[in-house]
């Protein structure tokens, strides 16, 4: 099943089900307005979303429209949090060294993780607004 978040002018976008070949999509407000809402009720909604996905792939959704990935936001434009388990030990070592802090031996074999800000994710194909160099 393929899901996406369509930019509808609201902060969290609108949930759409996308066809296997990425050519068509269908809105599913009767099931969940946003991807976060679908995830919150996943046990109940996953089978219903899967049924819509199958109907879409079978050409049985009259309200399907051409899918345009550039019209999408990030899947979860805002999230409660995100945690990344790919902290680089060499980077951690350099930062700690710059602060004059010892590098615990456990950092070389215990998993490292960091948490990032998640209040606003950029769309996958959206512009990155940069400040002027002037």
Name these PLM-found stretches.
Residues 1-7, 11-12, 20-21, 29-30, ...:
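Active-site microenvironments in enzyme catalytic cores
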């Amino acid at each position: 099943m393929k899901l996406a978040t369509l930019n509808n002018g609201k902060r969290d976008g609108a949930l759409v089900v996308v066809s296997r070949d990425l050519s068509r999509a269908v809105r599913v407000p009767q099931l969940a307005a946003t991807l976060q809402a679908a995830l919150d009720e996943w046990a109940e909604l996953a089978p219903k979303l899967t049924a819509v996905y199958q109907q879409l792939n079978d050409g049985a959704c009259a309200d399907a429209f051409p899918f345009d990935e550039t019209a999408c936001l990030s899947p979860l434009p805002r999230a409660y949090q995100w945690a990344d388990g790919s902290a680089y030990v060499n980077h951690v070592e350099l930062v700690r060294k710059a602060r004059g802090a010892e590098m615990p031996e456990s950092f070389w074999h215990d998993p490292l993780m960091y948490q990032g800000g998640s209040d606003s994710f950029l769309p996958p194909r959206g512009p990155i607004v940069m400040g002027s160099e002037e």
